[in-house]
Amino acid sequence: MDPSSKSPDDDDLRPEAEAARRPQPQPQPREWRFAQVFGERAAGEDVQEVDIISAIEFDKSGDHLATGDRGGRVVLFERTDSRDSASRSELERQDYPIARHPEFRYKTEFQSHEPEFDYLKSLEIEEKINKIKWCQTANNALFLLSTNDKTIKYWKVQERKVKRISVMNLNTSQSSGNGTTSSSSSSSSRAILPNGGCSEKLYNFPNNDLLFPPGGCTSLRLPVVVTGQDLNLVPRCRRVYSHAHDYHINSISNNSDGETYISADDLRINLWNLEISNQSFNIVDVKPANMEDLTEVITCAEFHPTHCNTLAYSSSKGSIRLIDLRQSALCDNHAKLFEEHEAPGSRSFFTEIIASVSDIKFARDGRHILSRDYMTLKLWDINMDSGPVATFQVHEYLRPKLCDLYENDSIFDKFECCLSGDGLRVATGSYSNLFRVFGCTPGSAEATTLEASRNPMRRQVANPTRPARTLTSLTRAVRRGGENPGVDANGNSYDLSTKLLHLAWHPTENSIACAAANSLYMYYA
């Protein structure tokens, strides 16, 4: 037999082939640590409604973070720690990568939206920021989209050198900002006339800030604009996209082509060009001819991260539709439909309410879609529309309380979701300022509950026995009006008035930013 020849089965004897057949080890659960907090609330401090955070978004690089609040403001943060600070020799000595402490600092803020009133519909339009999306950077400038219920704005934030006016023709050395002379000795040196006047003529220019020198001006000097070395961040609104939605805007999403984006309300999805603010194209319209025939509304819409012709949108019936913009101008027909069929006999009054999808996110590679409804997270494979590949129970202990949640409208809360950049984990929020992180690799049992506080792992302490309800705890519940109506699966009390709706995962690192009322908490693993 020729030694150079071999049978096809010989490859199976190689070590790498044998290793490939072995079950792959599961990623170890991450230990999450507190990194930073901005706007931390003191004990007993009341939170102003306008300060509550309503949107969070990392940019594509992860070096900038934007938040929006109910007061219509956008706040920008930038990363200050160097991700490449370790030397090569230090990295070579490490057996495993060490989790670095990510640090962000306040960069700037600006008023994005103001409260308005629609006189034709007698409708108040609040200034609350619903969504923020980062756009592609250019010339060291930051670009982002922000929207409230009706109007989308395109912002440019750039550093500019501060310009000052120098070589003034008038003497400003003896004046101060409040219009009075800055030196008491100079004012006392003037001769005071019997009628209370002054021997020197004082000409009042704006706020008495400028004084003519004694004897008048001998020569005329033009002011000179001098550019200093100080830098100042200047936000500027480049475009305003308005009058295109009859219903409240719930989503905006940038296209991977860098030129277009979509905006979605309850019944329509519009396609915009970033440079054209007076024209948009309606690509999805689910409004029936008779509004009495309306059975579902659009809840969220998201572009595919790499395919500029593909987008997904979710509905209040729990379905997700994938559409291809190349099929037709008006995408009435979907390319794929993702929905989970309910078990026979399991339908109740609350089934459709809790099935409504509040948020969807594409994975970074575009292969999977993560969706959040009231009770669960679902992970979908876009190549398999028969059902989700994984379902994660977020707060199953609330299922017996659905009637109470319906009475106080908590059942309509819209929780967001996010995925890690490597696609190995997903996260979403819950009540009592808690959020949960799940491992989504096949066979993973990772399910971590974290609290938005300086001690995120506080809720991890096992509590096998249900605490006894003493007289003190009973009177506390009555006094607070039942804000803590029960306990979760671990025996910890839950508070429906404190809910963590908004969070975002860093695009390349295991770092999560989440909002608890007016406070922004950041964690890393």
Swiss-Prot record:
Record keywords, A-Z: Repeat, WD repeat
SUPFAM superfamilies, per the entry: WD40 repeat-like (SSF50978)
GO CC, alphabetical: cytosol; protein phosphatase type 2A complex
Residue windows of the WD repeats: 48-87, 124-165, 244-282, 293-333, 352-390, 495-525
Residue ranges with Low complexity bias: 171-189
Domain of life: Eukaryota
Region annotation Disordered: where it falls in the sequence: 1-30, 169-191
UniProt GO molecular function: protein phosphatase regulator activity
Family named by the database record: Belongs to the phosphatase 2A regulatory subunit B family.
General function of this protein: The B regulatory subunit may modulate substrate selectivity and catalytic activity, and may also direct the localization of the catalytic enzyme to a particular subcellular compartment.
Subunit record text: PP2A consists of a common heteromeric enzyme, composed of a catalytic subunit (subunits C), a constant regulatory subunit (subunit A), and a variety of regulatory subunits such as subunits B (the R2/B/PR55/B55, R3/B''/PR72/PR130/PR59 and R5/B'/B56 families).
Protein name: Serine/threonine protein phosphatase 2A 55 kDa regulatory subunit B beta isoform
Protein species of origin: Oryza sativa subsp. japonica (Rice)
